[in-house]
Amino acid sequence: MIALVAASLAATAALAVAVSPAFGCSQGSHCYGTVRWLSSPDYYGGVAALQVARLEQSNTPTVDTGDFANQEMWVGTNGSGGGAYWVEDGMSRGYPQSAGAGIYWFWADNRPCCGYFEHDFIVTIRTSTTYNAKINFIGNNSWNVYRDGNLLSPGTSTSNPAPSNFLESGLEATNTNAHVNGTGAALQKRSAGGSSWSYGWSGANPYYISPAFSQWTASPTDYKDTMNPNTASLLAHTPHTVTSTLAGPPDPVALIIEAARLNGEASPSTIRTIATTRAAAFAAVGSGADDVPQTPTELVVAHGAFTGFEAKVPPGAPAPRGRVLYLLVDSGSGVVTDWGISNVDPQIQAVHH
């Protein structure tokens, strides 16, 4: 009997992979509900069919709080087996976009050379609709990023070596009262040394931090993740425009001061704004690629001691840190299209056009 009880307890423990107590979620301590494959064999890409029935970053999803909630996929880079470097692809709601923007698409990377860099796409992302996220190594230390089979623009992570030694997909949230009801399906990986794709992340296990949760629904290809999925919001679910916490029309300097505050620096210094193009700004921060649009952009740069509390990072990865914070603000709309933290100053001479 004792042996049977011990065996039962051991089996239960095996199912409860990396489950943490309910400490709460914050911008400095994100919560997750994922399936994760650490120290995987060498891979060169990943695919996940992502869907959300609900994605709200807080109990007040139409109010700007600096929080976000994501449904996403990470593919490790540079031989990292646990999340030091990566490319990610998925959907988000909340910061750095205004709460009124609703759900948007994004991708981001963290590279050995240049730190964290995020790219947001203000497009219509619907609930209960499947979107295919794909990340694929193309050689020359570069990865292409796709949504539904289409290369994003921008959509190339450069100076980011292969191989991948971890794959992960699921939810990430910065607020204990976030609401997520998501799924991932048809998980694939690309084998070493070729273009062969195969289904199943056979080495992955559910990982969650309460109140988030995740589990396989058809291992090792399909999973679900949830976080307060059925709790009623204080506001209606229909997204609508709200007044930003920043008064007046979009102001790049005000935006970077707010970004600095949210990323641990109350007194940023030597703030500089340069009128340029998005492509030139990418080149200036070491991310130049042919697929970056030539749209007019304000590159805003600040210095200080920044910790990327607002960075979308895999569980267990340290928040990106650096002395340089930069935003790319669309000159027409005032929307933040890209932002990053680095220890490398932008090459300002590259942005003049």
PLM regions with names:
Residues P314-H353:
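A short, surface-exposed interaction/processing loop segment used at functional sites
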Residues Q71-G79, G264, P315-A319:
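Short, solvent-exposed secondary-structure boundary motifs
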Residues M1-A22:
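Secretory targeting and sorting signals
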